[in-house]
């Protein structure tokens, strides 16, 4: 209590690119882009040029805000900003491709569970203890017939590894899918994916 409220520690600001900050930027850009692109009458048949334009409109204000930081003003910051823009445009094309190649349509961005009065995922451990999980799923898509898929945006290189799932070391996507299924009556599992 004393440390948290008396000393009020803050994270040290070190020069360099903060991966968590960039991850948040990518998430926000992907969410803004998805809202914009799915509102188009021609969606999901959207050209690369339109994808790039919409993502540029989504990511530019975020990059501008980031560039106001000491890191963003440096030469390295300029290079990082160019990389952010390139990666964001690639992500935009991937998002549209996911919809164009399937019968899925977006159901909800930032799908919350275990917060704001919504039920958490409840797990009972072997010793009888309960664990209550809460979270926020980047995107949930639905297809005709009630199939749900969850999408988690990743800016890093993480890939799905069934061996890690088997050993209980990579359960995030499975838990997200369980949370979505619990909140949507009559739905069934249709998949879970990382999107870069």
Where are these regions (language model features)?
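C-terminal, charged and often intrinsically disordered regions of DNA end-processing helicases
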Residues: 1-36, 130
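A non-catalytic, helix-rich entry segment at domain boundaries
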Residues: 29-119
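Secondary-structure transition/capping motifs at alpha-helix termini
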Residues: 36, 40, 97-103, 128, ...
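Secondary-structure capping and boundary motifs in well-ordered enzyme cores
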Residues: 18-25, 47-59, 76, 80-87, ...
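Non-catalytic protein-protein interaction segments used by genome-maintenance enzymes to assemble
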Residues: 107-181
């Amino acid at each position: 209590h004393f440390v948290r409220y008396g000393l009020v520690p803050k994270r040290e600001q070190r020069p360099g690119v903060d991966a968590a900050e960039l991850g948040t930027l990518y998430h926000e850009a992907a969410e803004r882009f998805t809202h914009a692109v799915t509102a188009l009458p021609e969606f999901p048949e959207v050209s690369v040029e339109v994808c790039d334009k919409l993502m540029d409109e989504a990511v530019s204000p975020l990059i501008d805000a980031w560039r106001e930081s000491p890191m963003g003003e440096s030469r390295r910051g300029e290079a990082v900003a160019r990389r952010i823009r390139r990666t964001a445009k690639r992500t935009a094309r991937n998002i549209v491709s996911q919809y164009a190649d399937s019968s899925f349509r977006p159901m909800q961005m930032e799908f919350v569970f275990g917060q704001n009065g919504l039920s958490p995922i409840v797990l009972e451990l072997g010793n009888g203890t309960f664990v209550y999980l809460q979270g926020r799923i980047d995107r949930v898509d639905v297809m005709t017939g009630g199939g749900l898929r969850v999408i988690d945006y990743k800016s890093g290189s993480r890939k799905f590894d069934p061996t890690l799932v088997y050993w209980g070391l990579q359960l995030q996507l499975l838990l997200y899918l369980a949370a979505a299924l619990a909140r949507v009556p009559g739905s069934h599992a249709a998949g879970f994916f990382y999107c870069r």
